């Protein structure tokens, strides 16, 4: 569970950005659970924004995210289209 302070913006990182950053920014599993009791009556605003690169965009690990302590987990680049298909197959949507 995650508890945010007032006036906080929460950004959920997706799988593609995780790959691009070599897990420097890990992907999150997004789940919303209503708080119990009176806290459920407080306002909560959510604005989803999804960004997907052009199908031919080559996903290569960002050089600044590779180090001796964090070697490149993805030495072979992949297009965003192929990556999306790979992920959809993994979760059995294709």
Go through the PLM ranges and name each one.
Residues 1-94:
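C-terminal flanking tails of non-heme Fe-dependent oxygenases
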């Amino acid at each position: 569970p995650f508890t945010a302070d007032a006036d906080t913006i929460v950004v959920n990182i997706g799988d593609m950005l995780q790959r691009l950053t070599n897990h420097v920014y890990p992907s999150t599993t997004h789940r919303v659970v209503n708080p119990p009791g009176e806290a459920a009556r407080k306002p909560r605003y959510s604005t989803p924004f999804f960004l997907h690169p052009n199908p031919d965009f080559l996903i290569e690990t960002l050089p600044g995210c590779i180090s001796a302590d964090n070697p490149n987990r993805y030495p072979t680049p992949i297009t965003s289209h192929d990556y999306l298909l790979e992920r959809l197959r993994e979760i059995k949507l294709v």
